[in-house]
Amino acid sequence: DDDTLTFNFAPSGDGNTHYLVCGISLSLNKKSDGYKTYGEDLSAKKNVILADITDIIGDYTMEQYNTDKSAVHDKILKTLQKKFGADYIVDVNIVSSLTQ
């Protein structure tokens, strides 16, 4: 999905609210069993996916995210793979990210 999304970070102790604005897309394996189950269109599962991503990003402060974006990426990917199948969701793409 090419929509721009906003996620809140965990409080960092500076008294300010910090957030991530980005686009998120999923790379899918069209040959997987999951593809046969869910197809190319995960829109019916969008709310579940976004809730998972929101929870994960909310576990990190902005500083933690900026220091180790790959940890956040890996946690999101592993969570979605566990839910939908590792052979189906092969990557999570966080694009045009802006933190504030």
Can you describe what each PLM-predicted range is?
Residues 1-100:
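Flexible, low-complexity charged segments
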